[in-house]
Protein backbone atom coordinates (compact mmCIF):
# COMPACT_ATOMS: atom_id res chain seq x y z
CA UNK A 1 0.00 0.00 0.00
CA UNK A 2 1.29 3.45 -0.90
CA UNK A 3 2.33 5.57 2.07
CA UNK A 4 0.30 8.70 2.74
CA UNK A 5 2.06 12.00 3.28
CA UNK A 6 1.28 15.51 4.48
CA UNK A 7 3.62 18.33 3.53
CA UNK A 8 3.79 21.13 6.08
CA UNK A 9 5.04 24.26 4.32
CA UNK A 10 6.20 27.02 6.66
CA UNK A 11 5.42 30.43 5.14
CA UNK A 12 4.62 32.64 8.13
CA UNK A 13 7.84 34.65 8.34
CA UNK A 14 7.78 38.44 8.64
CA UNK A 15 10.13 38.87 5.64
CA UNK A 16 11.93 41.73 7.39
CA UNK A 17 15.17 41.44 5.44
CA UNK A 18 13.35 41.48 2.11
CA UNK A 19 12.40 45.13 2.76
CA UNK A 20 9.05 44.66 1.06
CA UNK A 21 5.41 45.57 1.53
CA UNK A 22 4.46 41.94 0.89
CA UNK A 23 5.51 38.51 2.14
CA UNK A 24 8.73 37.27 0.59
CA UNK A 25 7.07 34.04 -0.57
CA UNK A 26 4.92 36.15 -2.91
CA UNK A 27 7.95 37.47 -4.76
CA UNK A 28 8.24 35.87 -8.20
CA UNK A 29 10.84 33.49 -9.51
CA UNK A 30 10.48 33.02 -13.26
CA UNK A 31 7.19 34.91 -13.19
CA UNK A 32 5.61 32.79 -10.45
CA UNK A 33 5.41 33.34 -6.67
CA UNK A 34 8.15 31.33 -5.00
CA UNK A 35 5.60 29.58 -2.76
CA UNK A 36 4.04 28.04 -5.90
CA UNK A 37 7.43 26.58 -6.87
CA UNK A 38 7.59 24.88 -3.47
CA UNK A 39 4.10 23.42 -3.81
CA UNK A 40 5.00 22.14 -7.28
CA UNK A 41 8.09 20.37 -5.90
CA UNK A 42 5.96 18.79 -3.18
CA UNK A 43 3.40 17.64 -5.74
CA UNK A 44 6.17 16.17 -7.92
CA UNK A 45 7.25 14.11 -4.91
CA UNK A 46 3.83 12.45 -4.92
CA UNK A 47 2.32 14.51 -2.12
CA UNK A 48 -1.19 15.84 -2.69
CA UNK A 49 -2.00 17.11 0.82
CA UNK A 50 -0.45 20.34 2.09
CA UNK A 51 -0.77 22.18 5.40
CA UNK A 52 0.28 25.76 4.70
CA UNK A 53 1.37 27.68 7.79
CA UNK A 54 0.81 31.36 7.11
CA UNK A 55 1.18 34.68 8.88
CA UNK A 56 1.64 37.92 6.98
CA UNK A 57 -0.55 38.32 3.87
CA UNK A 58 -2.23 35.02 4.73
CA UNK A 59 -4.96 35.16 2.08
CA UNK A 60 -2.61 36.21 -0.71
CA UNK A 61 -0.10 33.52 0.22
CA UNK A 62 -2.78 30.83 0.24
CA UNK A 63 -4.03 31.98 -3.16
CA UNK A 64 -0.54 32.04 -4.64
CA UNK A 65 0.15 28.52 -3.34
CA UNK A 66 -2.88 27.02 -5.03
CA UNK A 67 -2.05 24.68 -7.92
CA UNK A 68 -4.13 22.01 -9.60
CA UNK A 69 -4.19 18.58 -8.00
CA UNK A 70 -3.02 19.63 -4.54
CA UNK A 71 -5.33 19.90 -1.54
CA UNK A 72 -4.13 22.85 0.54
CA UNK A 73 -5.36 23.81 3.99
CA UNK A 74 -4.07 26.99 5.62
CA UNK A 75 -3.20 27.44 9.29
CA UNK A 76 -2.43 30.80 10.88
CA UNK A 77 0.61 31.10 13.14
CA UNK A 78 -0.36 34.04 15.32
CA UNK A 79 2.96 34.24 17.18
CA UNK A 80 6.45 33.61 15.81
CA UNK A 81 7.89 31.27 18.43
CA UNK A 82 10.22 29.16 16.33
CA UNK A 83 10.05 26.44 13.70
CA UNK A 84 8.76 23.78 16.08
CA UNK A 85 5.91 26.07 17.11
CA UNK A 86 5.19 26.83 13.43
CA UNK A 87 4.80 23.15 12.54
CA UNK A 88 2.40 22.65 15.44
CA UNK A 89 0.20 25.41 14.04
CA UNK A 90 -0.88 22.64 11.64
CA UNK A 91 -1.63 20.24 14.51
CA UNK A 92 -5.16 19.58 13.21
CA UNK A 93 -3.84 18.35 9.85
CA UNK A 94 -0.99 16.34 11.36
CA UNK A 95 -3.47 14.57 13.64
CA UNK A 96 -5.27 13.03 10.65
CA UNK A 97 -2.85 10.13 10.75
CA UNK A 98 -0.58 10.36 7.72
CA UNK A 99 2.27 7.88 7.38
CA UNK A 100 4.78 10.65 6.63
CA UNK A 101 5.04 14.30 7.58
CA UNK A 102 7.36 16.35 5.36
CA UNK A 103 8.37 19.78 6.65
CA UNK A 104 9.65 22.31 4.13
CA UNK A 105 9.82 26.08 3.69
CA UNK A 106 8.00 28.49 1.42
CA UNK A 107 11.15 30.51 0.71
CA UNK A 108 13.19 27.64 -0.79
CA UNK A 109 11.89 27.72 -4.38
CA UNK A 110 14.71 25.76 -6.02
CA UNK A 111 13.99 22.52 -4.17
CA UNK A 112 13.12 19.54 -6.37
CA UNK A 113 11.34 16.29 -5.73
CA UNK A 114 14.51 14.16 -5.51
CA UNK A 115 15.57 14.98 -1.93
CA UNK A 116 11.93 15.01 -0.78
CA UNK A 117 11.43 11.50 -2.12
CA UNK A 118 14.71 10.38 -0.54
CA UNK A 119 13.58 11.70 2.85
CA UNK A 120 10.28 9.84 2.55
CA UNK A 121 12.15 6.69 1.57
CA UNK A 122 14.18 7.06 4.75
CA UNK A 123 10.96 6.91 6.76
CA UNK A 124 9.81 3.86 4.80
CA UNK A 125 13.13 2.21 5.67
CA UNK A 126 12.49 2.63 9.39
CA UNK A 127 13.73 6.07 10.43
CA UNK A 128 11.58 8.20 12.72
CA UNK A 129 13.18 11.45 11.59
CA UNK A 130 15.06 12.13 8.34
CA UNK A 131 16.91 15.43 7.98
CA UNK A 132 17.77 16.81 4.54
CA UNK A 133 21.32 18.17 4.45
CA UNK A 134 23.68 19.66 1.89
CA UNK A 135 27.43 19.81 1.44
CA UNK A 136 29.02 23.23 1.10
CA UNK A 137 32.43 24.87 0.90
CA UNK A 138 31.04 27.67 3.10
CA UNK A 139 29.59 25.95 6.18
CA UNK A 140 30.06 28.90 8.55
CA UNK A 141 26.77 29.82 10.20
CA UNK A 142 25.01 26.54 9.45
CA UNK A 143 24.18 23.74 11.84
CA UNK A 144 26.46 20.74 11.16
CA UNK A 145 25.09 17.23 10.68
CA UNK A 146 27.04 14.82 12.86
CA UNK A 147 26.73 11.23 11.69
CA UNK A 148 27.93 8.00 13.28
CA UNK A 149 27.43 4.48 11.91
CA UNK A 150 24.93 5.73 9.35
CA UNK A 151 22.74 7.55 11.86
CA UNK A 152 22.41 11.26 12.55
CA UNK A 153 23.39 11.76 16.17
CA UNK A 154 23.13 15.56 16.39
CA UNK A 155 22.68 18.86 14.60
CA UNK A 156 25.38 21.04 16.11
CA UNK A 157 24.90 24.78 15.77
CA UNK A 158 27.95 26.87 14.90
CA UNK A 159 28.20 28.54 18.31
CA UNK A 160 28.11 25.19 20.12
CA UNK A 161 30.44 23.24 17.83
CA UNK A 162 33.93 22.11 18.72
CA UNK A 163 36.84 22.94 16.44
CA UNK A 164 36.64 19.43 14.99
CA UNK A 165 32.89 19.70 14.43
CA UNK A 166 33.34 23.01 12.62
CA UNK A 167 35.33 21.19 9.94
CA UNK A 168 32.20 19.22 9.00
CA UNK A 169 30.80 20.45 5.68
CA UNK A 170 27.47 18.59 5.74
CA UNK A 171 24.94 21.15 6.91
CA UNK A 172 21.30 21.28 7.97
CA UNK A 173 18.88 22.64 5.37
CA UNK A 174 15.97 22.87 7.81
CA UNK A 175 13.87 20.44 5.76
CA UNK A 176 12.96 17.13 7.36
CA UNK A 177 10.57 14.20 7.29
CA UNK A 178 8.92 12.79 10.42
CA UNK A 179 7.15 9.51 11.11
CA UNK A 180 3.51 10.57 10.89
CA UNK A 181 2.35 8.17 13.60
CA UNK A 182 4.83 9.64 16.08
CA UNK A 183 4.93 13.24 14.85
CA UNK A 184 2.60 14.89 17.36
CA UNK A 185 4.23 13.14 20.31
CA UNK A 186 7.70 14.14 19.16
CA UNK A 187 6.70 17.72 18.35
CA UNK A 188 4.93 18.20 21.67
CA UNK A 189 8.17 17.34 23.50
CA UNK A 190 10.08 20.27 22.01
CA UNK A 191 10.84 22.80 24.73
CA UNK A 192 11.88 26.44 24.68
CA UNK A 193 14.59 26.45 27.34
CA UNK A 194 17.01 28.46 25.22
CA UNK A 195 18.25 32.03 24.96
CA UNK A 196 15.44 33.11 22.62
CA UNK A 197 12.67 31.16 24.32
CA UNK A 198 11.70 29.56 21.00
CA UNK A 199 10.73 26.04 19.97
CA UNK A 200 13.28 24.63 17.53
CA UNK A 201 12.39 21.86 15.09
CA UNK A 202 16.00 20.66 15.12
CA UNK A 203 15.49 19.45 18.71
CA UNK A 204 13.59 16.50 17.22
CA UNK A 205 16.89 14.76 16.49
CA UNK A 206 17.82 14.57 20.16
CA UNK A 207 14.24 13.87 21.27
CA UNK A 208 13.73 10.98 18.83
CA UNK A 209 17.08 9.42 19.75
CA UNK A 210 16.35 9.72 23.47
CA UNK A 211 13.19 7.69 22.90
CA UNK A 212 15.09 4.98 21.05
CA UNK A 213 14.13 6.16 17.59
CA UNK A 214 16.28 6.07 14.48
CA UNK A 215 17.38 9.37 12.93
CA UNK A 216 19.11 9.61 9.55
CA UNK A 217 19.99 12.22 6.96
CA UNK A 218 19.87 12.44 3.17
CA UNK A 219 21.75 14.77 0.87
CA UNK A 220 20.54 17.49 -1.48
CA UNK A 221 22.40 19.83 -3.85
CA UNK A 222 23.40 23.00 -2.02
CA UNK A 223 21.77 25.34 -4.52
CA UNK A 224 18.41 23.58 -4.19
CA UNK A 225 18.39 24.31 -0.48
CA UNK A 226 19.07 28.04 -0.92
CA UNK A 227 16.65 30.12 1.12
CA UNK A 228 15.52 33.57 0.06
CA UNK A 229 15.70 36.35 2.64
CA UNK A 230 16.97 39.34 0.66
CA UNK A 231 16.67 40.83 -2.82
CA UNK A 232 20.27 39.77 -3.48
CA UNK A 233 19.41 36.15 -2.68
CA UNK A 234 16.31 36.43 -4.87
CA UNK A 235 18.55 37.43 -7.78
CA UNK A 236 20.83 34.42 -7.15
CA UNK A 237 17.83 32.09 -7.09
CA UNK A 238 16.43 33.59 -10.30
CA UNK A 239 19.78 33.20 -12.02
CA UNK A 240 20.13 29.54 -11.08
CA UNK A 241 16.52 28.75 -11.97
CA UNK A 242 17.07 30.26 -15.41
CA UNK A 243 20.35 28.38 -15.93
CA UNK A 244 18.75 25.08 -14.96
CA UNK A 245 15.73 25.51 -17.21
CA UNK A 246 17.78 26.72 -20.20
CA UNK A 247 20.02 23.68 -19.87
CA UNK A 248 17.00 21.37 -19.79
CA UNK A 249 15.59 22.99 -22.93
CA UNK A 250 18.83 22.80 -24.87
CA UNK A 251 19.13 19.11 -24.00
CA UNK A 252 15.61 18.66 -25.38
CA UNK A 253 16.59 20.11 -28.76
CA UNK A 254 16.16 23.88 -28.49
CA UNK A 255 18.95 26.04 -29.91
CA UNK A 256 19.92 29.11 -27.88
CA UNK A 257 22.75 31.11 -29.41
CA UNK A 258 23.51 33.01 -26.19
CA UNK A 259 21.54 31.16 -23.50
CA UNK A 260 22.66 33.42 -20.68
CA UNK A 261 20.68 36.27 -22.31
CA UNK A 262 17.42 34.33 -22.70
CA UNK A 263 14.90 34.58 -19.86
CA UNK A 264 12.14 32.02 -19.44
CA UNK A 265 8.96 31.88 -17.40
CA UNK A 266 8.01 28.95 -15.20
CA UNK A 267 5.65 27.56 -17.87
CA UNK A 268 7.49 28.43 -21.08
CA UNK A 269 7.22 25.65 -23.66
CA UNK A 270 9.65 25.55 -26.61
CA UNK A 271 9.63 22.76 -29.18
CA UNK A 272 12.48 20.83 -30.72
CA UNK A 273 14.54 22.62 -33.39
CA UNK A 274 13.24 26.04 -32.40
CA UNK A 275 15.90 28.75 -32.57
CA UNK A 276 16.11 31.44 -29.89
CA UNK A 277 18.45 34.33 -30.62
CA UNK A 278 20.06 36.50 -27.90
CA UNK A 279 18.16 38.80 -25.54
CA UNK A 280 14.72 37.22 -25.76
CA UNK A 281 12.33 37.41 -22.79
CA UNK A 282 9.43 35.00 -22.27
CA UNK A 283 6.65 35.94 -19.89
CA UNK A 284 4.11 33.43 -18.55
CA UNK A 285 2.01 31.50 -21.03
CA UNK A 286 4.36 31.38 -24.02
CA UNK A 287 4.29 28.31 -26.28
CA UNK A 288 6.79 28.08 -29.13
CA UNK A 289 6.35 25.16 -31.53
CA UNK A 290 9.10 23.19 -33.23
CA UNK A 291 11.08 24.95 -35.92
CA UNK A 292 10.00 28.45 -34.97
CA UNK A 293 12.58 31.24 -34.95
CA UNK A 294 12.58 33.98 -32.32
CA UNK A 295 14.96 36.75 -33.32
CA UNK A 296 16.86 38.95 -30.89
CA UNK A 297 15.28 41.41 -28.44
CA UNK A 298 11.77 40.02 -28.66
CA UNK A 299 9.31 39.78 -25.75
CA UNK A 300 6.67 37.05 -25.76
CA UNK A 301 3.95 36.53 -23.15
CA UNK A 302 0.70 34.56 -23.27
CA UNK A 303 1.27 33.82 -26.94
CA UNK A 304 1.52 30.84 -29.28
CA UNK A 305 4.01 30.69 -32.14
CA UNK A 306 3.34 27.83 -34.56
CA UNK A 307 5.78 25.61 -36.40
CA UNK A 308 8.10 27.48 -38.73
CA UNK A 309 6.83 30.93 -37.76
CA UNK A 310 9.26 33.82 -37.30
CA UNK A 311 9.21 36.57 -34.68
CA UNK A 312 11.33 39.71 -34.45
CA UNK A 313 13.83 41.12 -34.03
CA UNK A 314 12.43 43.68 -31.58
CA UNK A 315 8.90 42.25 -31.64
CA UNK A 316 6.37 42.02 -28.84
CA UNK A 317 3.71 39.32 -28.61
CA UNK A 318 1.15 40.00 -25.89
CA UNK A 319 -1.51 37.69 -24.42
CA UNK A 320 -3.79 36.20 -27.04
CA UNK A 321 -1.32 36.44 -29.91
CA UNK A 322 -1.50 33.28 -32.02
CA UNK A 323 0.82 32.97 -35.01
CA UNK A 324 -0.04 30.34 -37.61
CA UNK A 325 2.35 27.98 -39.35
CA UNK A 326 5.02 29.83 -41.32
CA UNK A 327 3.67 33.26 -40.44
CA UNK A 328 5.88 36.22 -39.63
CA UNK A 329 5.85 39.12 -37.19
CA UNK A 330 8.87 41.28 -37.91
CA UNK A 331 10.81 44.10 -36.30
CA UNK A 332 9.08 46.69 -34.13
CA UNK A 333 5.69 45.00 -34.35
CA UNK A 334 3.23 44.35 -31.53
CA UNK A 335 0.46 41.75 -31.59
CA UNK A 336 -2.18 41.56 -28.84
CA UNK A 337 -5.09 39.12 -29.02
CA UNK A 338 -4.45 38.71 -32.71
CA UNK A 339 -4.49 35.54 -34.84
CA UNK A 340 -2.35 35.23 -37.94
CA UNK A 341 -3.22 32.54 -40.48
CA UNK A 342 -0.71 30.31 -42.20
CA UNK A 343 1.92 32.32 -44.04
CA UNK A 344 0.51 35.72 -43.07
CA UNK A 345 3.10 38.49 -42.77
CA UNK A 346 3.29 41.50 -40.48
CA UNK A 347 6.78 42.58 -41.32
CA UNK A 348 7.54 45.87 -39.59
CA UNK A 349 6.37 48.84 -37.52
CA UNK A 350 2.83 47.56 -37.04
CA UNK A 351 0.25 47.18 -34.26
CA UNK A 352 -2.21 44.30 -34.50
CA UNK A 353 -4.76 44.28 -31.67
CA UNK A 354 -7.99 42.27 -31.42
CA UNK A 355 -7.69 41.08 -34.99
CA UNK A 356 -7.90 38.01 -37.21
CA UNK A 357 -5.63 37.92 -40.25
CA UNK A 358 -6.25 35.27 -42.87
CA UNK A 359 -3.70 32.95 -44.43
CA UNK A 360 -1.33 34.53 -46.93
CA UNK A 361 -2.25 38.13 -46.16
CA UNK A 362 0.42 40.83 -46.09
CA UNK A 363 0.24 43.76 -43.69
CA UNK A 364 2.33 46.75 -44.78
CA UNK A 365 4.66 48.82 -42.61
CA UNK A 366 3.03 51.24 -40.21
CA UNK A 367 -0.40 49.63 -40.31
CA UNK A 368 -2.54 49.97 -37.19
CA UNK A 369 -5.72 48.20 -36.19
CA UNK A 370 -7.57 50.90 -34.27
CA UNK A 371 -9.27 48.61 -31.76
CA UNK A 372 -10.16 50.93 -28.86
CA UNK A 373 -12.69 53.77 -28.85
CA UNK A 374 -11.91 54.88 -25.32
CA UNK A 375 -14.48 52.54 -23.80
CA UNK A 376 -14.72 49.28 -25.75
CA UNK A 377 -12.42 47.04 -27.77
CA UNK A 378 -13.58 45.97 -31.25
CA UNK A 379 -12.30 43.41 -33.74
CA UNK A 380 -10.71 43.76 -37.14
CA UNK A 381 -11.09 40.80 -39.52
CA UNK A 382 -8.82 40.52 -42.55
CA UNK A 383 -9.50 37.71 -45.00
CA UNK A 384 -7.08 35.45 -46.81
CA UNK A 385 -4.51 36.78 -49.31
CA UNK A 386 -5.42 40.40 -48.62
CA UNK A 387 -2.89 43.20 -49.06
CA UNK A 388 -2.83 46.13 -46.63
CA UNK A 389 -0.72 49.02 -47.90
CA UNK A 390 1.76 50.79 -45.66
CA UNK A 391 0.65 53.39 -43.12
CA UNK A 392 -2.98 52.29 -43.14
CA UNK A 393 -5.38 52.61 -40.20
CA UNK A 394 -8.13 50.02 -39.92
CA UNK A 395 -10.81 51.40 -37.60
CA UNK A 396 -12.59 48.54 -35.85
CA UNK A 397 -15.08 47.01 -36.07
CA UNK A 398 -14.25 46.44 -39.71
CA UNK A 399 -13.85 43.51 -42.11
CA UNK A 400 -11.51 43.31 -45.09
CA UNK A 401 -12.53 40.60 -47.54
CA UNK A 402 -10.40 37.87 -49.11
CA UNK A 403 -8.00 39.18 -51.72
CA UNK A 404 -8.87 42.84 -51.07
CA UNK A 405 -6.32 45.63 -51.51
CA UNK A 406 -6.03 48.63 -49.20
CA UNK A 407 -4.16 51.56 -50.71
CA UNK A 408 -1.25 52.94 -48.69
CA UNK A 409 -2.11 55.70 -46.25
CA UNK A 410 -5.80 54.82 -46.10
CA UNK A 411 -8.10 55.15 -43.10
CA UNK A 412 -10.64 52.35 -43.46
CA UNK A 413 -13.89 52.64 -41.52
CA UNK A 414 -16.28 50.63 -43.73
CA UNK A 415 -16.17 46.94 -44.61
CA UNK A 416 -14.28 46.14 -47.82
CA UNK A 417 -15.65 43.35 -50.07
CA UNK A 418 -13.49 40.52 -51.36
CA UNK A 419 -11.10 41.44 -54.20
CA UNK A 420 -12.00 45.15 -53.94
CA UNK A 421 -9.55 48.06 -53.84
CA UNK A 422 -10.22 50.56 -51.06
CA UNK A 423 -8.75 54.07 -50.84
CA UNK A 424 -9.40 56.27 -47.85
CA UNK A 425 -7.11 59.28 -48.16
CA UNK A 426 -7.10 62.88 -49.45
CA UNK A 427 -6.29 63.43 -53.14
CA UNK A 428 -2.76 64.72 -53.73
CA UNK A 429 -2.35 68.25 -55.14
CA UNK A 430 0.80 69.81 -56.65
CA UNK A 431 1.31 73.60 -56.60
CA UNK A 432 4.26 74.46 -58.83
CA UNK A 433 6.79 76.90 -57.32
CA UNK A 434 4.92 77.21 -54.02
CA UNK A 435 7.84 75.70 -52.06
CA UNK A 436 10.05 78.64 -53.07
CA UNK A 437 7.53 81.16 -51.74
CA UNK A 438 7.11 79.24 -48.47
CA UNK A 439 10.86 79.03 -47.98
CA UNK A 440 11.37 82.77 -48.64
CA UNK A 441 8.58 83.64 -46.21
CA UNK A 442 10.09 81.42 -43.49
CA UNK A 443 13.54 82.93 -43.97
CA UNK A 444 12.12 86.46 -43.72
CA UNK A 445 10.37 85.62 -40.43
CA UNK A 446 13.59 84.13 -39.07
CA UNK A 447 15.61 87.21 -40.07
CA UNK A 448 13.07 89.54 -38.43
CA UNK A 449 13.25 87.62 -35.15
CA UNK A 450 17.04 87.72 -35.24
CA UNK A 451 17.03 91.49 -35.81
CA UNK A 452 14.88 92.06 -32.72
CA UNK A 453 17.12 89.91 -30.49
Swiss-Prot record:
One cellular component GO annotation, for this chain's record? Answer: cytoplasm
- Linker: annotated span: 232-252
**Cofactor(s) needed by this chain:** Mg(2+)
Task: Please give the catalytic activity noted in the UniProt record.
Answer: alpha-D-glucosamine 1-phosphate + acetyl-CoA = N-acetyl-alpha-D-glucosamine 1-phosphate + CoA + H(+); N-acetyl-alpha-D-glucosamine 1-phosphate + UTP + H(+) = UDP-N-acetyl-alpha-D-glucosamine + diphosphate
Subcellular compartments: Cytoplasm
Name the positions where UDP-N-acetyl-alpha-D-glucosamine binds. Answer: 10-13, 24, 77, 82-83, 105-107, 143, 157, 172, 229, 318, 336, 351, 362
Quaternary structure, per UniProt, is: Homotrimer.
Q: What is this protein called?
A: Bifunctional protein GlmU
What is the native source organism of this protein?
Answer: Rhizobium johnstonii (strain DSM 114642 / LMG 32736 / 3841)
Amino acid sequence: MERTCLAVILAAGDSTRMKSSKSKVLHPVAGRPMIAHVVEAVASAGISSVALVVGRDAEDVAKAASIAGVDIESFLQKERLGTGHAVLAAREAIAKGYDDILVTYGDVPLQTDGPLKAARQGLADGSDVVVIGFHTDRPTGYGRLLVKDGELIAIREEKDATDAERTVTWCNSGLMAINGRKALDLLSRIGNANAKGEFYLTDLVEIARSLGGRVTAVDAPEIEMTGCNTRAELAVIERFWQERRRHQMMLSGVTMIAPETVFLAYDTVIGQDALIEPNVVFGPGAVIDSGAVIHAFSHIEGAHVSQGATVGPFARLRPGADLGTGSKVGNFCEVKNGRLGEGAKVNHLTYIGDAVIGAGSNIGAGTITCNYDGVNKSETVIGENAFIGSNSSLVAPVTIGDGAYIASGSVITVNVPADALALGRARQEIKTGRATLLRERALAIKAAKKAKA
